[in-house]
Amino acid sequence: MPIIYMNITLAFIISLLGMLVYRSHLMSSLLCLEGMMLSLFMMSTLMALNMHFPLANIMPIALLVFAACEAAVGLALLVSISNMYGLDHIHNLNLLQC
């Protein structure tokens, strides 16, 4: 396995561990989720470049579109929760209390 693939896999694992450790605040969770999406984007781009198949280039673009949608929804949720409760704690997302 080349060193670049190991670095990208390590970045994904570190972001995943950050998601598990810093799950009390929504902003920290969103940043870790963006790190995971960035490492997946880099991995899919490298795989598409190495495959030399023209139709494989659409996968990184689709992943980038989904990451942008996820970021927009996450930030809208963060603004809504911080306006409603004044904090960005994850435990405020309990649907039974709304």
Curated annotation (Swiss-Prot):
Membrane-spanning ranges: 1-21, 29-49, 61-81
Catalytic activities: a ubiquinone + NADH + 5 H(+)(in) = a ubiquinol + NAD(+) + 4 H(+)(out)
Alphabetic keyword roster: Electron transport, Membrane, Mitochondrion, Mitochondrion inner membrane, NAD, Respiratory chain, Translocase, Transmembrane, Transmembrane helix, Transport, Ubiquinone
EC number: 7.1.1.2
Record bears the keyword Glycoprotein: no
Role played: Core subunit of the mitochondrial membrane respiratory chain NADH dehydrogenase (Complex I) which catalyzes electron transfer from NADH through the respiratory chain, using ubiquinone as an electron acceptor. Part of the enzyme membrane arm which is embedded in the lipid bilayer and involved in proton translocation.
Protein name as catalogued: NADH-ubiquinone oxidoreductase chain 4L
Gene name for this UniProt entry: MT-ND4L
